[in-house]
């Protein structure tokens, strides 16, 4: 846990909500609480704290809205549905959130994010960041690509595609593919195959691989064509991808640390296991 530098100026707060009725109600209550408080200034421009109201998808959108300001921004999530992995507060805990923010001392919890670098055949380079995951697929035909880990050719992959996830993203698409669940404070990436071909002719490892912070992953397609690349909830299509590189970004996402911070394992239990039967 680290602490962000604080000054005597008012804390700038951005409130981002989805269009659901309950989310709008929460947003209105937060606006009313901070609007006339001299210690806070409501603004979506250059905020110190971003309050995301909705679900994990809303927080993903908020992350990408402010991904160029990660050094200066801390996030906090309010869930208006079932408990999310990025949310510490439910919609009925708004008063607790308001009180915690009024007593905030700048403490934060940081999680690693994914750096994505796409190189095209024409020399163009596209750079992006992902909070959860990125995939590369070739929809119309089997994807054939070399998987290179830390400059070592690990395997030649044949199948539908490849997913690379962050620890926080390990509970999303990665888990549905049989990948491991990683605690978000672990600085590592996870590479997971999507429907790989495994028979007497073609072989892949067939299981997820955990990649440490110091190593990088390269996916090098071996066939020309159109590739579909997802970066969190955004999907793009590129023709003739030379390679796509994945590594842990120099930046991280910072969350407001409060007494109400829900432990990661509580979130996993709530999402996938629930209360045990007696």
Curated annotation (Swiss-Prot):
- Kindly identify the residues recorded as the active site: 56
**Record keywords, A-Z:** ATP-binding, Cytoplasm, Kinase, NAD, NADP, Nucleotide-binding, Transferase
Q: Which InterPro entries match?
A: ATP-NAD_kinase_N, ATP-NAD_kinase_PpnK-typ_C, NAD/diacylglycerol_kinase_sf, NADK
Q: What is its EC number?
A: 2.7.1.23
GO molecular function terms noted in the UniProt entry: ATP binding; metal ion binding; NAD binding; NAD+ kinase activity
User: Which cofactors?
Assistant: a divalent metal cation
Give the subcellular location. Cytoplasm
> Where the protein is mainly located, per its record?
cytoplasm
What does it catalyze?
Answer: NAD(+) + ATP = ADP + NADP(+) + H(+)
Q: GO CC terms on record? A: cytoplasm
- For this UniProt entry, which segments traverse the membrane? none
General function of this protein = Involved in the regulation of the intracellular balance of NAD and NADP, and is a key enzyme in the biosynthesis of NADP. Catalyzes specifically the phosphorylation on 2'-hydroxyl of the adenosine moiety of NAD to yield NADP.
Protein name (record): NAD kinase
Which source organism?
A: Streptococcus agalactiae serotype III (strain NEM316)
Provide the organism lineage as a comma list.
Answer: Bacteria, Bacillati, Bacillota, Bacilli, Lactobacillales
* Name of the gene encoding the protein in the UniProt record: nadK
